[in-house]
Amino acid sequence: RFKKIRRLGALPGLTSKRPRSGSDLKNQLRSGKRSQYRIRLEEKQKLRFHYGLTERQLLKYVHMAGKAKGSTGQVLLQLLEMRLDNILFRLGMASTIPGARQLVNHRHILVNGRIVDIPSYRCKPRDIITTKDKERSKVLIQNYIASSSHEELPNHLTIDPLQYKGLVNQIIDSKWVGLKINELLVVEYYSRQT
């Protein structure tokens, strides 16, 4: 994990740790000139590691984004941001995306009153995300909400920490994506692969 954040920069979805300010400068001096391929590859890896996806999963999302209307890069980010595990992370119900994925896999999360155990479940506007009524589930979420840094919540989400309930208001706008990334480089990377 630390090698990844040292090489690619801050990845809030993977870990809350940040790279040291001097380490990035050393890497750039040591590596010399970066090729265009390397720049595109690093952007793709940043996206992959932040959202915790395999290469195959990311490729599937790129193909889905390519078929949809609109800018492929923007649609790709919207698809990734509307995943259930990412929404739990952005609501502050989990400290990292892998932590959110574990909550979903262990069946602690309900979407619109139904248990969902698929982390890649695509949330839609007006979805209500809650925890199970069991005490263990509520304690887990309560600990995460209490320890989460209360950064500004994106416009497309609302949380009620007392009821352990989150609401998806709308599809995310690209300016609220929690990662500094040039999504066009990711699309370029895959368009050159085929």
UniProtKB/Swiss-Prot annotation:
Family annotation (Pfam families): Ribosomal_S4 (PF00163), S4 (PF01479)
Tell me the SMART domains matching this sequence: Ribosomal_S4 (SM01390), S4 (SM00363)
Major subcellular site: plastid
One Gene Ontology MF term? rRNA binding
Disulphide bonds annotated for this chain are none
Can you cite an annotated GO cellular component? chloroplast
Q: Which PROSITE patterns match?
A: RIBOSOMAL_S4 (PS00632), S4 (PS50889)
Domain named S4 RNA-binding: residues:
82-143
Sorted keywords for this record are:
Chloroplast, Plastid, Ribonucleoprotein, Ribosomal protein, RNA-binding, rRNA-binding
Which Gene3D superfamilies does this chain map to?
A: Ribosomal Protein S4 Delta 41, Chain A, domain 1, RNA-binding S4 domain
InterPro entries attached to this UniProt entry? Ribosomal_uS4, Ribosomal_uS4_bac-type, Ribosomal_uS4_CS, Ribosomal_uS4_N, S4_RNA-bd, S4_RNA-bd_sf
Q: Where in the cell is it found?
A: Plastid, Chloroplast
Check the record and name the PANTHER family matching this protein.
30S 40S RIBOSOMAL PROTEIN (PTHR11831), SMALL RIBOSOMAL SUBUNIT PROTEIN US4M (PTHR11831:SF4)
Q: Could you give the subunit structure recorded for this chain?
A: Part of the 30S ribosomal subunit. Contacts protein S5. The interaction surface between S4 and S5 is involved in control of translational fidelity.
The record's function comment reads:
One of the primary rRNA binding proteins, it binds directly to 16S rRNA where it nucleates assembly of the body of the 30S subunit.
The entry assigns this protein to a family as follows: Belongs to the universal ribosomal protein uS4 family.
- Protein name, per record: Small ribosomal subunit protein uS4c
Its source organism is Cypella sp. (strain Porto Alegre 027)
What's the encoding gene here?
rps4
